[in-house]
Amino acid sequence: MKKFKMVIIALVVALLVPSSAFASSMETLGSGEWDYIGYDYFRTQSKNFYSGGGDFMICLDSSSPKGNYYLFEEDPYSRDDKVAGVYFNGGSGDNFYKVGNLPHCHIFRDIGGFVDGTNDRAEFYVSRSTDTGEALVGAYD
């Protein structure tokens, strides 16, 4: 019985401690790499995505409606700041490019001036002027 308990304890410990092969396969994001923030399905305005500054990237799903997409920085006590706009045409003749394995991405460069507030973050959201269907956006910082 004592030997059986030792085998069970050894098995539990082996399962709780990650192997070096598993640990080395985990990706560590560092400076100069894109950190995934999240995604949102939206019709005219996405949820807020928090950015620490530098560059900010959005990626649209190919099923997202064609048209103008705008990046805004939310200001709770004043008018929201329009960062920039970009036209999405489904990947043909627009300003969206493949970044790594992510198709239909646009990078907004040098947006650190929009970082504000007590959380020292910029609160970005993506907006569309017309509701022509549901868009799917992914955000990266």
Where are these regions (language model features)?
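Sec-dependent N-terminal signal peptides of Gram-positive bacterial secreted proteins and lipoproteins
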Residues: M1-A23
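Post-signal peptide N-terminal regions of Sec-secreted extracellular proteins
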Residues: S24-D141
